[in-house]
Design a protein with these regions (language model features):
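Short, structured segments at the rim of ligand-binding sites
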Residues: 1-174
Length: 174
């Protein structure tokens, strides 16, 4: 952060044939504290790991929980996840501590309306679904084929390498 120059302050000019550079006198800079929350998409991997690893209990502190980014939490809770949101703070972005405990997950039929708010977390949801009881159905996720890489194909390959039984479709996985 810097103080804007006062119009009365003198400017020093350096000129050559093509360019002019204006240099203002020394200015005061002020420090400030900035609290940068943890990224929810990055936290999602730890959330799912805690859910599926026996006897796990972790708290992820100061994670951004903007409602447009946390659809995965709603889906996991619907699957039976033991997740608690604590210490909610209203900053520039809403943040909270997320407590996760090992849980027995159940399969779901994912509502396609949730896909736009889950697009970055779908690969980790596939992993959670592999540990759920029953058959999870995910459709409407064709956008994953056009991201930086074909994430549906990559996840299909990864799930196959792990021995997970699934069926891949152009817009999702069962």
């Amino acid at each position: 952060l810097r103080k804007e120059p006062d119009e009365s302050e003198e400017q020093e000019e350096i000129e050559d044939e093509k360019k002019t550079i204006k240099i203002f006198p020394s200015q005061e800079f002020y420090s400030t504290n900035i609290d940068i929350p943890g990224d929810f998409s990055s936290a999602s991997f730890l959330i799912v790991a805690a859910l599926i690893i026996p006897n796990s209990e972790i708290t992820l502190k100061n994670i951004g929980i903007n409602p447009s980014r946390t659809a995965l939490l709603k889906v996991l809770v619907e699957m039976g996840a033991n997740i608690k949101i604590n210490n909610v703070k209203e900053n520039i972005e809403r943040t909270a501590d997320i407590l996760i405990k090992t849980s027995s997950l159940n399969a779901i039929v994912l509502d396609e309306k949730l896909i736009p708010n889950l697009i970055d977390e779908l690969p980790i949801l596939f992993i959670a679904s592999a540990f759920a009881k029953g058959k999870t159905i995910i459709r409407g996720a064709g956008e994953l084929r056009t991201k930086e890489s074909d994430r549906l194909e990559a996840m299909s390959n990864a799930l196959g390498n792990l021995g997970v039984k699934f069926q891949s479709y152009r817009d999702g996985i069962d």
